[in-house]
A protein has these predicted regions:
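Conserved protein kinase catalytic/activation segment
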Residues: 1-12
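Activation segment
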Residues: 42-47, 68
């Protein structure tokens, strides 16, 4: 929660799904826009999912829009894959729900690879009507979004406009 529009102080709230890290009993956890790949794919999770959520929230506070505004779990996974690439094979092989989103193939050398199912294939298999959702950014990587997102808005201070080009944000985005 943003405590004051004039100050960058935030307050962490809503611990409704909080649990001891050794007793992860929930399967439906995290708000969709901030849901980690581990949770989406049905992997065992740890406090690392909180760092994912925090990163998504920090980016949203900076840009004013969510980074992964998925309209469904499939749409959420597809947005993450578009920006970050296909998860490692081990995550897909271990994830209980990964087969809902990915199909196994073989490359020309006989090695297994995984590919995100098309929206049509997913809809057909799941009996849903997935629809493309709004895309807020033309860029596909976080550094590109930070560089190209039109930050200036009405009544913005010059310091707020300059943050869009701040090198610390770009360094952080490249390391993430």
């Amino acid at each position: 929660m943003l405590k004051n529009l004039e100050s960058p102080i935030i307050k962490i709230i809503d611990f409704g799904s909080a649990c001891d890290e050794r007793q992860t009993v929930y399967t439906y956890i995290q708000s969709r826009f901030y849901r980690s790949p581990e949770v989406l794919l049905g992997l065992p999770y740890s406090s690392a999912i909180d760092i994912w959520s925090l990163g998504c929230i920090v980016v949203e506070l900076f840009l004013g829009l969510p980074l992964f505004p998925g309209s469904s779990e499939y749409n959420q996974v597809s947005r993450i894959v578009e920006m970050l690439g296909t998860p490692p094979n081990w995550m897909i092989e271990v994830g209980k729900q990964a087969g809902d989103f990915f199909e196994k193939r073989q490359d020309e050398f006989g090695r297994k690879t995984y590919h995100l199912k098309s929206m049509e294939q997913y809809s057909r298999e799941r009996g849903t009507k997935e629809q493309p959702s709004k895309k807020y950014f033309q860029a596909n990587t976080l550094p590109e979004i930070i560089k190209t997102y039109p930050m200036p808005r009405k009544n913005m201070k010059q310091s707020e406009i300059d943050r869009g080009k701040h090198p610390a944000w770009l360094r952080w985005a490249r390391q993430s």
